[in-house]
């Protein structure tokens, strides 16, 4: 009997004290939290829920009234860190805050984003620390992704509070870089704004091509003007035309070529100064024709000289070619003689 009672007492588990039971429950909860960590909510703390149970909708999505009725930070005494409301326009401050800044951008909103201390509390998204706001939104986004994987409900990320928070937080560094670039642009006193009158170096990749083309056109025009002046001087020197002095008075003396060309073209021959408008035009036309004739004669003469020079070079090259051919024939004949002598010597050595 005693042995049976002792055996039963050994087999029965000993009752645990209440503090030990609570300690075991706390350990189990801590193990669940370590295996299934739940990040901090930006709105409030919620109790730990097992992964097999569906969370309450208030844990996933905060009430809309709390989102839209949150008070904005005052611009006096603290930096601007962005509003946590759901309105897209809430990220902008009042016009009076930015009246001294270009484009309505705040210069100091990036300082709190990187210089503020990290706040791991649940209300870090509502604190003046933008880093805590960014951390809270990131943790809430990861928790919502985990809950969406467990829940059969479709995702409504466009209604979530973290979507607006991430939108504001992501926009701040780009706005800070934009503000820095704008400060660099507006700060330079010698900066010139781009307008429609932009030089060719900004319109084309390689402006040297177009500048080179302009230089070539200028050189061609200068060469043409030089040729005309040369023809005019040559015509005067050969007494083909006479200088036209409009302010002169008295008799007009024309060259024989001018008189002949005037008659040939059907114009009247002027006799005295001052000349009428028609007489001036007729003399200009006649003198231009004489210059063109002289220019054509010069071009034909130069062409004939060039052809004569080419013919002379051709004659010289042909004579040189003939002499080289004679030398080749002589060398071939001497080579044949040497080969015959070599064969004779080889035959004598064999004998």
From Swiss-Prot:
Keywords: DNA-binding, Nucleus, Transcription, Transcription regulation. Residues 307-314 are annotated as: Leucine-zipper. One of its GO terms (biological process) is positive regulation of dauer entry. The keyword Nucleus applies. It comes from Caenorhabditis elegans. GO terms for cellular component: nucleus. GO terms for molecular function: cAMP response element binding; DNA-binding transcription factor activity, RNA polymerase II-specific. Residues 282-345 form the bZIP domain. PROSITE patterns: BZIP, BZIP_BASIC. Residues 82-95 have a biased composition (Low complexity). The lineage of its organism: Eukaryota, Metazoa, Ecdysozoa, Nematoda, Chromadorea. Transcription factor. Plays a role in regulating the developmentally arrested larval state known as dauer, when induced by long-term exposure to the Gram-negative bacterium P.aeruginosa PAO1, but dispensable for dauer formation induced by starvation. Involved in regulating expression of microRNA mir-243, during long-term exposure to P.aeruginosa PAO1. It is found in: Nucleus. Induction: Expression up-regulated in animals exposed to the Gram-negative bacterium P.aeruginosa PAO1 for two generations. It holds the Pfam family bZIP_1. Residues 46-104, 119-149 are annotated as: Disordered. The keyword DNA damage does not apply. Residues 284-304 are annotated as: Basic motif. This is CREB homolog crh-2. Belongs to the bZIP family. CDD domains: bZIP_CREB3.
């Amino acid at each position: 009997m005693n042995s049976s009672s002792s055996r039963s007492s050994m087999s029965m588990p000993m009752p645990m004290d209440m503090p030990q039971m609570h300690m075991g429950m706390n350990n189990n909860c801590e193990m669940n939290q370590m295996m299934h960590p739940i990040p901090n909510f930006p709105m409030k703390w919620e109790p730990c829920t097992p992964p097999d149970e569906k969370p309450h909708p208030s844990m996933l999505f905060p009430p809309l009234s709390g989102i839209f009725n949150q008070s904005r930070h005052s611009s006096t005494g603290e930096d601007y860190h962005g509003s946590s409301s759901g309105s897209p326009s809430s990220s902008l401050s009042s016009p009076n805050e930015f009246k001294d800044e270009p484009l309505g951008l705040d210069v100091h909103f990036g300082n709190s984003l990187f210089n503020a201390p990290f706040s791991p509390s649940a209300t870090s998204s509502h604190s003046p620390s933008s880093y805590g706001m960014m951390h809270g939104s990131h943790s809430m986004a990861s928790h919502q992704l985990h809950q969406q994987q467990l829940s059969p409900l479709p995702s409504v990320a466009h209604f979530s509070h973290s979507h607006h928070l991430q939108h504001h937080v992501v926009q701040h560094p780009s706005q800070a870089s934009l503000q820095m670039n704008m400060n660099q642009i507006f700060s330079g006193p010698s900066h010139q704004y781009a307008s429609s009158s932009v030089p060719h170096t900004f319109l084309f990749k390689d402006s040297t091509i177009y500048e080179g083309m302009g230089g070539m056109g200028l050189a061609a025009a200068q060469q043409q003007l030089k040729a005309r002046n040369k023809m005019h001087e040559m015509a005067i020197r050969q007494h083909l035309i006479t200088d036209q002095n409009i302010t002169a008075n008295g008799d007009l003396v024309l060259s024989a070529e001018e008189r002949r060309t005037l008659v040939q073209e059907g114009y009247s021959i002027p006799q005295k100064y001052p000349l009428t408008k028609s007489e001036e035009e007729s003399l200009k036309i006649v003198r231009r024709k004489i210059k063109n004739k002289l220019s054509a004669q010069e071009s034909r003469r130069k062409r004939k000289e060039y052809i004569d020079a080419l013919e002379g070079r051709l004659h010289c090259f042909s004579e040189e070619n003939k002499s080289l051919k004679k030398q080749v024939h002589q060398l071939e004949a001497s080579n044949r003689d040497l080969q015959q002598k070599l064969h004779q010597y080889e035959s004598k050595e064999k004998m």
